[in-house]
């Protein structure tokens, strides 16, 4: 009877750890960081010899029982979304388990409550619209032109929701979003609701379709030798980029037939104080767009502002190339996010995402490629440069995390 009770307890412990790990991954944490938190929680809950196996889109836990049997627990996980508040709540649960405030009886309910937190879609829509407006101003659009990306982003988000509801494959959803944003942008300019060029709205919408959280987590997992997780995230990014290529090719081909006035590839440069201000506002809006509350909005503004100051100093003051400036700024962002995360309950990757999206995305480069494409000349150089910057951002942030870990002398398995 005693052996039976002990086995039941071990099974309960394994199920709790598996539930916690799956929750962290579904909320948007990298696999390596989720395993680090899960390992600490497992030890505190009484599982000393637990093995975590990376299987990409599923997580596997193996634990040896005293009778010599090895029990395996697996959970499917989604890697395509991020819920900042859910992630914060689950991180708090991990801290409470580590501090002994939660045990095997109380932890399951705490995990379930954390996983039940959902983001308000309408607030997320408002946050995305404000973020698109701020990015457009940083690209160089005037106030009336910047209204276009904000309105277009609403239609893009609605198209994404509809596609998700009727289970259209993501590749085609993204392609449809690319085409919808072009149609809406053209309609807004033709009706006079916003000022031209409408290509600014298209460029900003295309940039925001790139799943930047997946790029960050992909690099983190690759650095920590979790190849299957990194490959699964790479596939997610590739599907989104493939959709942009399909939809973008259709937009450019049709646009060449109907666009009489080719967009000017040069735009005005936003004054430095305004560039910094809208980076701050954009980061705060991005926090809202990703389900963040006031506890995230203000820190997001801080990291967005600091990242923008670094990037503007490098690009305007030192006239550094965009890719190099973005990479160096991303390293600083990773450092700041790690140290700030020590004071908050959000993972460093969440804070890094806020600052990156608001201050470092290569919106102007995408716009220049789009404007060049409408002239009949390939804009592939600009598109490849934009893709390079997106990858450099992920690598830079991951490097910042690694440097911060060395400074703090944290073990290699401990999450930043």
Where does each model-flagged region fall?
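Membrane-interface helix termini and inter-helical loops of multi-pass transporters
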Residues: 193-197, 255-269, 372-382
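Core alpha-helical transmembrane segments of integral membrane proteins
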Residues: 117-218, 287-290, 294
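C-terminal transmembrane helix-loop-helix hairpin of multi-pass membrane proteins
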Residues: 201-205, 217-241, 272-274, 298-416
